[in-house]
Amino acid sequence: MAKFIVLLSLVAAIFSVLICEGEVESMKNLEVDLGFSQVPVDSACEGRNLSPQIEIHGLNSTSLAIIVDDIDAPSETFTHWRIRSIMPLDLIPAGMPNNLEITTPLKAIQGSNSFGKIGYMGPCPSKGKPHRYYFRIYGLDRMLDLDPEATRQELENAMKGHILQQGEAMATYQR
């Protein structure tokens, strides 16, 4: 009988963990809408190089961080934008200024991209095949206390354990 009770307790504990994991997993989903599947020229190096508008649905977090990567770059993943400490907004407006600290149209801190510049730098792949650009949005449980010039690795380390929600959208660009 004692073995049965222990086994029953173990099954109940496993079931409880599975239910909790399911709740956490479903809570993490954000719907991210760029309004396009191909990056417009205005948001690329050949155009005005403006960060695109990003709509975020299902947001229930204290702050946001956004990382935009080209996963098809020849040598390694190429980061086009890192922005963090954004108040939770359903709409990130287009054309964010390329300043380290932004005060308008919203407050945020931007990091350097793989070009070595602060702020958004649009797609600029070599001519040929299209590249895929992932816009990853992280809903965090707090504003991150980081040096304004923190590296990507420092940002990712600071986000560990604080991501409540996440979502992504992918768009392509070809020259």
Regions found by a protein language model. Name each.
Residues 5, 9, 15-175:
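N-terminus-centered regions that define maturation/targeting leaders and the start
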